[in-house]
Amino acid sequence: MAKDNQQIATDDMQQTIYKELGYKSYPFPFTTPAYLEAYGTLVGLKPPTAKTARVLELGATYGGNIISQAVHNPEATFVGIELSQDQVEKGNKIISDAKLDNVSLLQGDILNFDESLGNFDYIIAHGFYSWISDEMKDKLLDIISHHLADNGIAYVSYNTYPGWHTMEEVRQLMLFANRGYDELTHKEKVLRGKTVGSLVGAQILNYDNLKERNSKFLGALRSVIQKDDYYVGHDHLEPHNDPCYFYQFNDHLKAHNLSYVCDADLTLSMVRTYDDSIADKLEKLAPNSQADQEQYLDFMLDTTFRKSIICKESAAKDISYDVANPDKVNTVPVRSIVNSFVFQILFDEEALKMFENELVRDTFQALIKDGGTFNMIEALAILKAAHDTANASEDDLEPAVCSLYKAIVEHMVRGGIRFYKTFPDKQEYMEGLSYVPARFTNFVKAIADGGSEYIYGANMFNDAVGDISEEDLLFMELLNKPKAKSTMIKKIKDSLFSADKAQTGKHQNAMAEAFYNELTKRMEQLGFIRRKKNDGLS
């Protein structure tokens, strides 16, 4: 399938913007198989097991989103398709340097998609749909329709109206500011766009009536000016940026025998988590359509971006949004779903006052003190122990259990609690038993040796980690097998502190021990720690 000259010119400009503005490929936590598996499970689907999934990313750039996933998920397989030969070559060099054999980048145009690649459990297209032609949009959904496993999950993100109407004003201002300046590089055009935008915004702020009338525009303008140059060049100066309404995207899915599941931001999907008045009105406006309710919600929230989770039409019959209804959270089907997850609390103890039920509050406090990761068996055991310690009435127990389920679901939706069916591997450091496997060390070394120009490091949740350092790499290389604390401290002192003659041996030991304590905790947080059976300390 051949492209027209306009699309070829658009592709060329995109690649020029990438090169001139120093684009880096981000990891995104909401695109991982474990994340998508959990969200599909939440609404009643039975997605493929994340641990051994086969994953395709379309528009993979340098591979920054899937290389990190491959490091943390060695039993899964990842394939990225990218138009730019330069980005594919650089990404594959990072993969080679990291010695990874479960991820690859392929140069190709999705219009000429290689059908021999077969089917995938999960298909990802982040930051792609809004920046391609209608023909390519059709092809993207055609690939998902024909290459997604029957119970598979896909993810597509895109800019949305109505919120992007205001952003479109900012985009048009920046395009107008650069009209007639074809000789400028894209970096210079971004600078000119930001400068002109600042001048226009400053003039509006000089007049109270204009400031009030243009408050939304000023907010959007301020947001864009503060963004990285790459984002501004990509979203506001590329020739193609095509937002749509959510209902239009949903209609496009239906045309390809695909169905919408929910958004990766559950607050856009679980309308019952808003107050009853909003939920009741949305249900009256669209009593039999989840998608229409979400479209009305987009009008209310002025939504600018969506991260849609998708399945095949044939699987959609199992979808239920009962988990979002507080009146149904404590039914057997919903409790069964909630019981299948492992959770991580993201709020701290200062937020506990939001829980009215004292037993629920005590339960969350105990869970946070224990590290914040738990399952429902553990949470219910803690709740029961708190109930018994308080000598509370037996009649108080079941209401507290109901309140606990409601609280957990509410914060799953609002983002205060992460949840997974396949929880990313995170282990505590144990002296003499724990070590850093070579795959993590090789990954960090590949980043340190030049890969950081193109991709970020990431933890086990695929959150970007931008501060990976030579000290991290040194520690990882030292902890290549289980070692005694004393051995590690001596090696750290010899490597980092022994040359400092201004410090006594005692001070050097203290600094080495502090470094050891800090780095073992950091390795835990990054998900780089694994444990071997105790074969003796070395």
Per-region residue spans from a language model:
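Conserved SAM/SAH-binding beta-strand->alpha-helix loop
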Residues: 84
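Conserved class I S-adenosyl-L-methionine
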Residues: 156-183, 203
